[in-house]
């Protein structure tokens, strides 16, 4: 079961003026569940995005990247679950284009103004006719307050829908931010089997929106890992309708931009943490903090060496304080000039190791008590600089194997 995720209620997800969402049931993988989401955007909405760095990226990623960098404003997004349209060659590209073209005809825009997204099984042909046939159904229930249904429609192996809203004041104007995401397995930085859609009604220029999505991603979705597998389909899309009524934000030094950046990053980080908390088979949520490094990059290397380790993740599942595994991971993280005698390792607030070995004050029963909790914090102090980073992961349980062994059945 998900680790400490409060139940999401529809009224918690606030509408964004200028944006509507509609869902449909197309039976792409199985009948009786929402598996198509359409998002329509008002004119003058600005859109920015980041995508997977997997070289075997899916057809919709290729098409979405192309459309997003084109000269025409984006007017709609179409997302399907149950089929990734990845590893499908030219026919996959053709199917992604056909989906965009069909939606464009229905809403009266150009094909290049639609962004396609898919998630599901790889190397199976996209059932494009099912999707096209059910687009009118999705358009028929378009509504600005349909965020909860949208969060349900993009789920695959997720157990719970994921969404969050925040409101901030910018120079006396209320600005709303709402986001949804899906993801449970194949979660790894740059990015993952993760789809995220965040929208705001703030007025902000396109270059700043591009900066915002990259900044938020680096501090959220690129700070999580479930199993170390990088997906073919992941994307994070940030949309700004500009209908809040605030004075348009045009420079990054504007306090309004700093406030908006912090709020969007908070929403992205909460969504990313929900993905880890709902990790396939997860029973524990693990925070890995690495401090006092020379650079953020070396802190990140150490953090991911720990967070990716199957030995550490299974020890967390078993509540086994076999903490030498953490020291080993720090050692193979690739920090060439690391002085291990300076490194300090904490489990929660308990000092576990220092001076190259076990701390004199550490007692195994204290370690086990912390490991038995549903939330575990592992802290590493490199004591060689002022940089730091935080990464979130989960444990590795028997159910992870079962879920993925049964994925296509």
UniProtKB/Swiss-Prot annotation:
Keywords attached to this entry: Acyltransferase, Amino-acid biosynthesis, Arginine biosynthesis, Autocatalytic cleavage, Cytoplasm, Multifunctional enzyme, Transferase
Record's GO cellular component terms: cytoplasm
Domain of life: Bacteria
Positions contributing to substrate binding: 156, 182, 193, 280, 404, 409
Protein's UniProt keywords contain Glycoprotein: no
Site features described as Cleavage, chain residue numbers: 192-193
Classification via SUPFAM superfamilies: DmpA/ArgJ-like
InterPro entries referenced in this protein's UniProt entry, alphabetically: Arg_biosynth_ArgJ (IPR002813), ArgJ-like_dom_sf (IPR016117), ArgJ_beta_C (IPR042195)
Location within or outside the cell: Cytoplasm
GO BP field: L-arginine biosynthetic process; ornithine biosynthetic process
Catalytic reaction equation(s): N(2)-acetyl-L-ornithine + L-glutamate = N-acetyl-L-glutamate + L-ornithine; L-glutamate + acetyl-CoA = N-acetyl-L-glutamate + CoA + H(+)
Family (UniProt): Belongs to the ArgJ family.
Protein's name in the database: Arginine biosynthesis bifunctional protein ArgJ
Organism: Nitrosomonas europaea (strain ATCC 19718 / CIP 103999 / KCTC 2705 / NBRC 14298)
